């Protein structure tokens, strides 16, 4: 089995929102990614609507269903509704995505930069996971590779974890990836032993993805946005997506 690519289109919305109006069109960009071979589309709507908005989520849900690819909605399950943002649970009720990835990011964070602390996020998180799974969605929890309680995600009811790969990307860029890869491989093995599927995401790129997949067993899906869109500025969107698909074809999921 080949690791699946879910393209995060948040950065398309950032560019659109910086000018106002409808261009670039998030749905058109997502359609181009799917045509180039992406296996799914990811969005992370935030309460401040800095990029993906509620109407984008609805439109992309319709597109992914029509194209028969997976839709993955990321978000903070604890963030309350506010003007223009109905809350993660309500967005998911309206769209029933194939996967919901829960992320503990605060309103002021520039980007997601840490996973759940299972020593604290327990009872309320378990209740929310149950509510999301009642929609028929697969639930994944964003976690740090060094979290000693990764197996706790299974006890809380999650189906998968998403390994936060920012530290790996930083280590790879500085030529010091080996020790970090060992940490991620161990995390993946612990997750697999607990019966959890393994996703990965954050700062993965054409430069570092192949090395990551070669060292970390069982990665079912990678979610890639910032690097892919950045590379698309030079390569074109179609070519950028195809480059990732080629990397994934060169690696196979192993237990």
Curated annotation (Swiss-Prot):
It holds the Pfam family PdxJ. Its EC number is 2.6.99.2. 1-deoxy-D-xylulose 5-phosphate binds at residues 46, 51, 111. It catalyses: 3-amino-2-oxopropyl phosphate + 1-deoxy-D-xylulose 5-phosphate = pyridoxine 5'-phosphate + phosphate + 2 H2O + H(+). Keywords: Cytoplasm, Pyridoxine biosynthesis, Transferase. 3-amino-2-oxopropyl phosphate binds at residues 8, 19, 203, 225-226. It is found in: Cytoplasm. InterPro entries: Aldolase_TIM, PyrdxlP_synth_PdxJ, Pyridoxine-5'_phos_synth. It is an enzyme of class 2 (transferase). The active site is at residues 44, 74, 202. Signal peptide: none annotated. GO terms for biological process: pyridoxine biosynthetic process. One of its GO terms (molecular function) is pyridoxine 5'-phosphate synthase activity. Pathway: Cofactor biosynthesis; pyridoxine 5'-phosphate biosynthesis; pyridoxine 5'-phosphate from D-erythrose 4-phosphate: step 5/5. The record marks 162 as: Transition state stabilizer. GO terms for cellular component: cytosol. Catalyzes the complicated ring closure reaction between the two acyclic compounds 1-deoxy-D-xylulose-5-phosphate (DXP) and 3-amino-2-oxopropyl phosphate (1-amino-acetone-3-phosphate or AAP) to form pyridoxine 5'-phosphate (PNP) and inorganic phosphate. Belongs to the PNP synthase family. Homooctamer; tetramer of dimers. This is Pyridoxine 5'-phosphate synthase. The lineage of its organism: Bacteria, Pseudomonadati, Pseudomonadota, Gammaproteobacteria, Lysobacterales. The gene is pdxJ.
């Amino acid at each position: 089995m080949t690791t699946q690519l879910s393209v995060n289109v948040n950065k398309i919305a950032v560019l659109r929102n910086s000018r106002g109006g409808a261009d670039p069109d998030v749905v058109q960009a997502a359609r181009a990614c799917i045509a180039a071979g992406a296996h799914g589309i990811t969005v992370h709507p935030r309460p401040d609507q800095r990029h993906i908005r509620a109407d984008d989520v609805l439109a992309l849900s319709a597109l992914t269903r029509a194209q028969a690819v997976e839709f993955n909605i990321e978000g903070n399950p604890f963030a309350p509704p506010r003007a223009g943002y109905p809350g993660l649970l309500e967005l998911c009720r309206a769209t029933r995505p194939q996967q919901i990835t829960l992320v503990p990011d605060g309103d002021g964070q520039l980007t997601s930069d840490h996973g759940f602390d299972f020593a604290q996020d327990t009872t309320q998180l378990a209740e929310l996971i149950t509510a999301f799974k009642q929609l028929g969605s697969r639930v994944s929890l964003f976690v740090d590779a060094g979290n000693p309680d990764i197996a706790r995600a299974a006890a809380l009811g999650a189906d998968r974890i998403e390994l936060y790969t920012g530290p790996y990307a930083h280590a790879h860029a500085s030529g010091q990836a080996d020790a970090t890869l060992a940490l991620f491989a161990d995390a993946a093995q612990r997750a697999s032993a607990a019966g959890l599927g393994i996703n990965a995401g954050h700062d993965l790129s054409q430069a570092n993805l192949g090395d990551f997949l070669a060292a970390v067993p069982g990665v079912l899906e990678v979610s890639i946005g910032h690097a892919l869109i950045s590379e698309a500025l030079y390569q074109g969107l179609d070519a950028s997506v195809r480059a990732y698909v080629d990397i994934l074809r060169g690696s196979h999921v192993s237990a």
